[in-house]
UniProtKB/Swiss-Prot annotation:
BP-aspect Gene Ontology terms: methylation
Keyword tags: Methyltransferase, S-adenosyl-L-methionine, Transferase, Ubiquinone biosynthesis
Top-level enzyme category: transferase
Lineage summary: Bacteria, Pseudomonadati, Pseudomonadota, Gammaproteobacteria, Pseudomonadales
Cross-referenced Pfam families: Methyltransf_23
HAMAP family associated with the record: UbiG
Family: Belongs to the methyltransferase superfamily. UbiG/COQ3 family.
Known role: O-methyltransferase that catalyzes the 2 O-methylation steps in the ubiquinone biosynthetic pathway.
Gene Ontology terms, MF aspect: 2-polyprenyl-6-hydroxyphenol methylase activity; 3-demethylubiquinol 3-O-methyltransferase activity; polyprenyldihydroxybenzoate methyltransferase activity
Source species: Pseudomonas syringae pv. tomato (strain ATCC BAA-871 / DC3000)
Record protein name field: Ubiquinone biosynthesis O-methyltransferase
Amino acid sequence: MSNVDRAEIAKFEALAHRWWDRESEFKPLHDINPLRVNWIDERANLAGKKVLDVGCGGGILSEAMALRGATVTGIDMGEAPLAVAQLHQLESGVSVEYRQITAEDLAEEMPEQFDVVTCLEMLEHVPDPSSVIRACHRMVKPGGQVFFSTINRNPKAYLFAVVGAEYILNLLPRGTHDFKKFIRPSELGAWSRDAGLQVKDIIGLTYNPLTKHYKLASDVDVNYMIQTLREA
């Protein structure tokens, strides 16, 4: 059985044509992208690395990592977002290989092939997040790093990421997130360790609605990222 939620795919298919519009529903992704790429690059030194971006969507993160000197492959199960990603790289001149394939299927095909694997804002959109984490472990080389980001599951996260972001501030389309699919850091850490990944670092991402700016912070109550390592 494929680890794909067709309803989740459909949400992003419908919006795909606006993926690179910085004033669209994807504005938050554009705004946080530099922060996330810097955090990853500081830890993984992307230049010259072979990188896999799992759940790449329209390619915002994939292109940014390629611009840092990485050789990037982006995978997603959404046909429309991938088409947008492929079109945009023709416009930008940034080279990324895009494929429509699940992480689990690619892990069968390309085990231990990547220096770095990123899986950002994707785990909360699949039926079995732990399956994706195991696949990421299989695809990264021994000694390589895997980065995940998702949303914490607690009342504050519901208030900020669902009620605030989708209904009050209109940062995201209503229905983008399902609170039940949010993932606590303890759960993500346990799934990572069970898969053979050692958690090395965690950082939160906070939003100030007055200044409309994001910043990295120790507060992991809502959005957060983790750095994991596959032991050599």
